[in-house]
Amino acid sequence: DPETHELISSPRTEQARAFVTKIWNASRFVLGNLEGFTPGEPVAATPADAWILSRLAGLSERVTQGISEYKFGEVASDLHAFFWNEFCDWYIEFSKASLREGADPAARLQTQRNLVFVLDSALRLLHPALPFVTEALWEQLPHAEGEDAEALMVATWPEPETLARFKNAEAERAIELV
């Protein structure tokens, strides 16, 4: 009722708000740590890199298949778990050592490249569910040479076949032990 000026709120609304805030803050972290960045390919230079790239490859498979099978609840759950638990809670935390002042410049650059690649791919996978937020953030990311999409909505999808090169069951098992 517009006359009562009540806020729309529910546990799911609060969870969605918290997730969007997490996406925004993680993106701001990555964007705020790109001093000296030059585009380049993602490389599994560390066990954490191998793990997150492998997890991203699996996510792309599950999301692509889930969308094709209209399993939107599973897709949303997979995206949330990857972004919040794996990318934010683990990989960003692992990356901080390489991003510190005084860290090895080559390790810093590769960490930056991997952060940008994973964030870019995650935003592409999240885009069907969160188009406005993901578009605004994606437009701020540095893009690889040859990326000719002017907007995320027309950018290429992170195809499972393309990301399959990152699959690494051993790296996933190693990080699970941490």
Task: List the predicted regions and their residue ranges.
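Aromatic-lined ligand-binding clefts that engage carbohydrates, nucleic acids, or primary amines
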Residues: 76, 80
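Acidic, turn-prone loop/beta-hairpin segments
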Residues: 36-64, 92-178
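Conserved phosphate-binding loops in nucleotide/dinucleotide-binding enzymes
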Residues: 1-18, 69-74, 163-175
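Catalytic adenosine-cofactor/nucleotide-binding cores of aminoacyl-tRNA synthetases and other
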Residues: 1-43, 143-148
